[in-house]
Amino acid sequence: MSTVNVQIGLHELLNGSNAQIQLSVPQLVEKVLMRNEGKLTSTGAVSASTGKYTGRSPKDKFIVKEASVADKIAWGAVNQPISEEHFNKLYTKVLEYLKEKEELFVFKGFAGADRNYRLPIQVINEYAWHNLFVHQLFIRPTEEELTTHESGFTIVSAPNFKADPAVDGTNSEAFIMVSFEKRIVLIGGTEYAGEMKKSIFSIMNFLLPEQDILSMHCSANVGEEGDVALFFGLSGTGKTTLSADPNRKLIGDDEHGWSDNGVFNIEGGCYAKCVNLSHEKEPQIFDAIKFGSVLENVIINNQTRIADYNDTTLTENTRAAYPMHAIDNIVLPSVAGHPNTIIFLTADASGVLPPISKLSKEQAMYHFLSGYTSKLAGTERGVTSPQATFSTCFGSPFLPLDASRYAEMLGEKIEKHDAKVFLVNTGWTGGEYGVGKRMNLGYTRAMIQAALSGELAKTETAKHDIFGLEVPLHVPGVPDEVLMPEQTWADKAAYKAKAIELANEFKENFKKFESVSEDIINLGGPIA
């Protein structure tokens, strides 16, 4: 199937009598309720369930193996290839399926808040609530922009269309396929709305580096003086909590680009975790869940329609989608200057990494490629053992290119713009999980404040004898003994053994980066 035929098929779909294009938020909310796709909550948000798929389905994600991209993609478990033939046949079937639907919902908008680098996108949805979701998550066009909007990428989403693995070359009924030549994302068999968000992020992770822009899985904020900070970190490291600062304005909570102009948000909204959400803990997120926002897999009281954020019956991965303007203290448009400070967050359950350390350029590249944190294993028979988790560039499921490409760009930009990089451990202190305790949040905030203010630039440091990290000896508001992790352990020999164990896990994980320069390994990694 040629690109021309693909476009003809799309044109027919978009011009069919069932296509509802660019409905407003109130119109979409009405459609969701009339079609019985979701419920209205007590705060006016729409609540929907995603069925059996309550999270991303990485084994069902494919990139079409096309001549123009075949030698650029880092093929493997993350970027699984699928043939053009399989894609073309499935695409034709999905289009025929959607043509028969009573209604289709179309959103046209953008990915990328910097107008110089934004990608015009359109999303064709089987579900009204999915269309409301993308309306809130991506960047909404003005009426004037809509008149000249020409899509550079189209998502075609048909959650009720199930693939046949024997015929379609998929691994299950669900599929998320990206064709870079045809500029199409094809999604079916899963109702999880996050697949649409992350598909566009994966695409931007391919397109932006081609324009010498580093795409990043991080949150970003800006201070009153215009100083920009980036926060990288995997789930559970405190990224959302620590980047929500009343004294700083939020640029974005999840996906950013770093160009020669500075930093920009890729999205126009937030996709926040809701598990155990309360007004006390996360007032910004709690208050953003209002009319037009979308709740995903959150249990709602049938009578009062009040959301119960502590109920994880459906999943722990409960989510809220809302536009940036639903929260106070933001930058609009979501663009800012070059980062002054970069924070890598890790929740080290082995309790051996310092609570804060300064990183050289090589160490920054090493820890960026490592993307380390801990996940806690199950607590069967009362035994808990933390498991080291490494997610390349703090976002391995979304990186189509070789990881070294992103790391090299980060190194170049750190050097060019003199960004200061810190590794912050929000995990355990005084012993590993089960012995020590979680790092005091107040101390972590004080350390980050000292990093952002420039205070740590002039603070005396000591080199960690196992990880080679420069550890500040004094931070205002933090007891000195907390800064050196070994000092917090009663058993110093046990600390050393545990630290060497983690250092070896870093080294073992790093063996997969064959194309990385020796400098990053020799100057960036553990020294013992």
From Swiss-Prot:
InterPro entries: PEP_carboxykinase_ATP (IPR001272), PEP_carboxykinase_C (IPR013035), PEP_carboxykinase_N (IPR008210), PEPCK_ATP_CS (IPR015994). The keyword ATP-binding applies. Its cofactor is Mn(2+). Binds 1 Mn(2+) ion per subunit. It comes from the Bacteria. ATP binds at residues 198, 217, 233-241, 282, 319, 444. Its EC number is 4.1.1.49. Pathway: Carbohydrate biosynthesis; gluconeogenesis. Involved in the gluconeogenesis. Catalyzes the conversion of oxaloacetate (OAA) to phosphoenolpyruvate (PEP) through direct phosphoryl transfer between the nucleoside triphosphate and OAA. NCBIfam families: pckA (TIGR00224), PRK09344.1-2 (NF006820), PRK09344.1-3 (NF006821). PANTHER family: PHOSPHOENOLPYRUVATE CARBOXYKINASE (ATP) (PTHR30031:SF0), PHOSPHOENOLPYRUVATE CARBOXYKINASE ATP (PTHR30031). This is Phosphoenolpyruvate carboxykinase (ATP). The gene is pckA.
